[in-house]
Amino acid sequence: MNIKEQIAKIRAQGYDQIHAEARLCQDIIIQALAKSTLNQNVTIKGGVVMRSISKDARRATRDLDIDFIRYSLEDSHIDNFIKEINCLDRISIMRIGDIEELKQQDYHGKRIHIKVSDTYGNSLISKIDLGVHKDLSIKQEEYCFDICFTETNASLLINSKEQMFTEKLRSLLKFGSFSTRYKDIFDLYYLSPLVDKKFLMLCFEKYIFNDTGMKENNLEDIIRRVTKTFENSSYRRKLKTTETNWLKKDSNEVLEGILHFFKKQM
């Protein structure tokens, strides 16, 4: 595979240069993971899944988010992880730089930077955020990713739509109008008609209602908190002007749609 040629093909699909490079790098890692011995020890999450299920280049993301399943986040295990996914013909995958501790809003994990190279002297540098999927009672979904450089799909586990919805909502509930994860709002709106209501309520129980660090104990509490956040004028103003509105929908319509979704669950 020639990295430079593949990037040109991806750009022809509507991606800019940065996101074309990221898409190719992500697909290389996903393909390598699917072929590796660790394919049942990881679950893919975040923007890569959102972009894949929506099939919308506007939801493209530069990073790759992975949670380990029954696999340690220790540095030595991360290095073994890289060794295991360096398994594609004529493609080299290696870690560069240090393994970083990662602490963001409502997220703790590690970050690694990787270099992907072909045999033509081309290379890409990207980053992977790594965490741990701790609650094994929340089943992961088997999903086939379209890989941009081959007609063969890559089958891996992903966070379900219901889990993604719940985790995005959980962050919004915790930080309220101080949340800066505006893209999550448009993701919530997109996911709302796609989730299974029964499984969603199970995720709410696990990640929100039964979490002693959360203040919400039922749907009424969620609606009350979300309504208060959405009524904040500063939050609405920032949401209206954000560049992360990948749906290109009116932000007021999006907020109303999310609230309507919650009220329908009552």
Residue ranges and their predicted role:
Residues M1-V42, S52-A60, L64, F68-M266:
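Structured mid-to-C-terminal alpha-helical surface segments
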Residues I44-V48:
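Glycine-rich beta-strand-to-loop/alpha-helix junction loops that act as flexible
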